[in-house]
Curated annotation (Swiss-Prot):
Glycyl lysine isopeptide (Lys-Gly) (interchain with G-Cter in SUMO2) cross-link site: 8, 15, 138
Summary of activators and inhibitors of this protein: Autoinhibited by a module composed of four alpha helices (HI-1, HI-2, H4, and H5) that flank the DNA-binding ETS domain, reducing the affinity for DNA. Phosphorylation by CaMK2/CaMKII in response to calcium signaling decreases affinity for DNA.
Positions bearing the Glycyl lysine isopeptide (Lys-Gly) (interchain with G-Cter in SUMO) cross-link: 15, 227
Keywords: Acetylation, Cytoplasm, DNA-binding, Immunity, Isopeptide bond, Nucleus, Phosphoprotein, Proto-oncogene, Transcription, Transcription regulation, Ubl conjugation
Quaternary context: Binds DNA as a homodimer; homodimerization is required for transcription activation. Interacts with MAF and MAFB. Interacts with PAX5; the interaction alters DNA-binding properties. Interacts with DAXX. Interacts with UBE2I. Interacts with SP100; the interaction is direct and modulates ETS1 transcriptional activity.
UniProt-annotated location(s): Nucleus; Cytoplasm
Residues carrying Phosphothreonine: 38, 265
Protein known as: Protein C-ets-1
Phosphotyrosine PTM positions: 223
Location of the region described as Helix HI-1 in the Swiss-Prot/TrEMBL record: 304-312
Cytoplasm found in the keyword field: yes
Residue positions, PTM Phosphoserine: 251, 254, 267, 270, 282, 285
Region annotated Helix H4, chain positions: 418-422
Length: 441
């Protein structure tokens, strides 16, 4: 980027051009065109970037991308990233990490967002995303009608290689009675990610109930629109994966970079966003921080329980519910703390430090330090301890995922609808793991 700058208090950017990240120097390099980022030049760079970002407005209008990024579909996010890559000549961007809708993207938080892209590249993208959010305007419309979303000219070759086809609009089903919907059910089950805002605006979410979480052909979800606003097919455009129907994600960043209480979505047989992060791993990948292996060529069918039952290599040394497999099954992306706890709880070799009490979904951390150590190892956080882990657990309280059992030390209970998600009753899992009721009971 080249800019003629008046260094007087009335700072003015006269001209901005396309930015090539390779032009940005390291502290030991000399560059006459672009100054080093110092506290005094930070605002200057921010203004220059903002001026360059203005070029995205034409792209928004051309593709019908809403101005509020929280209302973006996965296709809109994809178009935005591709625009930025071309506009700034960005290097090393892993497009798979951005396969989510705008609500999920905005809900990540800065720290988690920056993990999606290389150094400085993430800062560029985050700066633009923040600017777009602060504008806080309604989605772009033409004559009061929601626009169609033509395919970006940047996307055809790359995303076809990942099996992603043109967006398919799925019409809303008939409204159903919402009175039996709980927040935890809503949190752990498939939802239409296109209409959701970030978790900061959770009170504005529509209530959702799943007609059949195991539909093998089409996505069928009932919507309850708030403020008498009925969702239209345009609001529910979702990418379709030709190599398998995959799950979606909205996420929530907590203290110590916990990937806590991400909104979980469809099983393999469901259709939504977050396409290329859906995985069916081998057991060899369960102790890896990396994403598990890619989907097989065939389309997996059935429930998570069916998947586990069909595993020929399942034995007493392997967890019944491996966290990586559950993350892939739900499409939640990186392994979440609650998924990791389920892995430990369904691994007989871990019963010395964490186990079910025998009372439903209640469990006890017999050695909380060992649980924290293993979580830190899994997330590559060597300073992890129980104090930090418990802070992560507390983020689940308000979400009705996990609650602390009153009067019992290190005892917690899953209060969400795990049975519908996993296909197991707690009694079935207890029998498989030879769990005996806690003597304290």
């Amino acid at each position: 980027m080249k800019a003629a700058v008046d260094l007087k208090p009335t700072l003015t950017i006269i001209k901005t051009e396309k930015v090539d990240l390779e032009l940005f120097p390291s502290p030991d390099m000399e560059c006459a065109d672009v100054p080093l980022l110092t506290p005094s030049s930070k605002e200057m760079m921010s203004q220059a970037l903002k001026a360059t970002f203005s070029g995205f407005t034409k792209e928004q209008q051309r593709l019908g991308i809403p101005k509020d990024p929280r209302q973006w579909t996965e296709t809109h996010v994809r178009d935005w990233v591709m625009w930025a890559v071309n506009e700034f000549s960005l290097k090393g961007v892993d497009f798979q990490k951005f396969c989510m809708n705008g609500a999920a993207l905005c809900a990540l938080g800065k720290e988690c967002f920056l993990e999606l892209a290389p150094d400085f590249v993430g800062d560029i993208l985050w700066e633009h995303l923040e600017i777009l959010q602060k504008e806080d305007v309604k989605p772009y419309q033409v004559n009061g009608v929601n626009p169609t979303y033509p395919e970006s000219r940047y996307t055809s070759d790359y995303f076809i290689s990942y099996g992603i086809e043109h967006a398919q609009c799925v019409p809303p089903s008939e409204f159903s009675e919402p009175s039996f919907i709980t927040e935890s059910y809503q949190t752990l089950h498939p939802i239409s990610s296109e209409e959701l805002l970030s978790l900061k605006y959770e009170n504005d979410y529509p209530s959702v109930i799943l007609r059949d979480p195991l539909q093998t052909d089409t996505l069928q979800t009932d919507y309850f629109a708030i403020k008498q606003e009925v969702l239209t097919p345009d609001n529910m455009c979702m990418g379709r994966a030709s190599r398998g129907k995959l799950g979606g994600q909205d996420s929530f960043e907590s203290i110590e970079s916990y990937d806590s209480c991400d909104r979980l979505t469809q099983s393999w047989s469901s259709q939504s966003s977050f396409n290329s992060l859906q995985r069916v791993p081998s057991y060899d990948s369960f102790d890896s921080e990396d994403y598990p292996a890619a989907l097989p060529n065939h389309k997996p069918k059935g429930t998570f329980k069916d998947y586990v039952r069909d595993r020929a290599d399942l034995n007493k040394d392997k967890p019944v519910i491996p966290a990586a497999a559950l993350a892939g099954y739900t499409g939640s992306g990186p392994i979440q703390l609650w998924q990791f706890l389920l892995e430990l709880l369904t691994d007989k070799s871990c019963q010395s430090f964490i186990s079910w009490t025998g009372d439903g979904w209640e469990f006890k951390l017999s050695d909380p330090d060992e649980v924290a150590r293993r979580w830190g190892k899994r997330k590559n956080k060597p300073k992890m301890n129980y104090e930090k882990l418990s802070r992560g657990l507390r983020y689940y309280y308000d979400k009705n995922i996990i609650h602390k059992t009153a009067g019992k030390r290190y005892v917690y209970r899953f209060v969400c609808d795990l049975q519908s998600l996993l296909g197991y009753t707690p009694e079935e899992l207890h029998a498989m793991l030879d769990v005996k009721p806690d003597a304290d009971e």
